[in-house]
Design a protein with these regions (language model features):
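C-terminal, well-structured subdomains that either form a transmembrane helix-short loop-helix hairpin
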Residues: 49, 53-56, 62, 139-144, ...
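Cytochrome P450 heme-binding "Cys pocket" and the immediately downstream C-terminal segment
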Residues: 80-83, 192-193, 206, 210-256
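Short, small-residue alpha-helix embedded
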Residues: 64-77, 220
Length: 275
């Protein structure tokens, strides 16, 4: 009865929200407004489908990006050799932050390796992404999976497994430079199974916005590296809170509810002298 009552109470509010999103006179036309008016769509979405898609868009379109940015910045702060190399690269490549473009950033192989390693070591969606086995079933290695079964891989377990990665709990962008030895490939990572890191999912239903995610991460971090010098806060209350990121259970545990429930991160920023 309690669940039924909650559902009944939510329905009028949901109807009001959807009506507001469909308001033709509104000056703010968001993505749901345009989805509902797509003339090429086979049919409009039902209220429940709209609600599920709004939840997905908010989670995938904002929460994951902010998680990647925070974890990337954390790893740059604690791996000063990576920070110095990447900051020097950005500052030499671009004479002014206004010169920073996606086209130029895409050519920075080491920068991409740093991003991929940040996505690996702290996958923004660290809980399972279920997939349904086709009706005829599927053979996965020695195992036959019957049709209709839901299967998934735990991203955090996959990327932290020694079966898949050498030094799995350490941040090493070099592992992603196998095809670019001139940029510092380390043979110690020869046997890494890079395909085990799937931060955007895998197969035909992987995240359709992953390219946009890479664009946003490249642009934001490149501008931060060009304009600022920064380091992790290690003193006081903020420094104490930053210790949660070490994954040392003595300082507390990270939690994940579909996406990473990241703790606060405290960084000291100082504008570079002479710019």
């Amino acid at each position: 009865m309690i669940v039924s009552y909650q559902d009944m109470s939510a329905e009028p509010e949901l109807a009001n929200i959807l009506q507001g999103l469909a308001d033709e006179t509104s000056t703010h036309k968001d993505v749901i407004y345009h989805v509902q008016r797509n003339q090429n769509a086979r049919k409009s979405l039902a209220p429940t489908e709209l609600l599920l898609n709004m939840t997905l868009l908010v989670t995938a379109g904002s929460e994951t990006i902010s998680s990647v940015l925070v974890t990337f910045m954390y790893n740059l702060c604690i791996h000063r050799d990576v920070y110095e190399r990447l900051a020097t690269m950005i500052r030499i490549t671009f004479a002014d932050p206004s010169d920073i473009t996606l086209q130029e950033l895409e050519g920075l192989v080491y920068f991409d390796a740093c991003i991929k390693e940040a996505l690996r070591i702290f996958p923004p969606v660290s809980s399972n992404l279920p997939r349904e086995v086709p009706a005829k079933g599927a053979q996965v290695g020695p195992h036959f999976l019957p049709g209709g079964m839901l299967v998934s891989v735990a991203p955090w377990a996959a990327v932290r497994s020694k079966d898949n990665f050498h030094l799995p709990n350490e941040y090493h962008p070099e592992r992603w430079l196998r095809n670019h030895p001139e940029h510092g490939w380390d043979p110690a990572f020869e046997n890494d199974k890079l395909s085990a890191s799937t931060p955007f999912g895998a197969g035909p239903k992987q995240c359709m916005g992953q390219n946009l995610s890479y664009y946003e991460i490249r642009l934001i971090v490149a501008h931060l590296l060009w304009v600022f010098d920064f380091e992790l806060e290690t003193e006081g209350v903020e420094g104490e809170k930053n210790r949660l990121w070490s994954l040392d259970p003595h300082f507390g545990l990270l939690r994940s509810f579909q996406t990473l429930n990241r703790p606060d991160l405290y960084i000291r920023f100082q504008e570079r002298a002479g710019i």
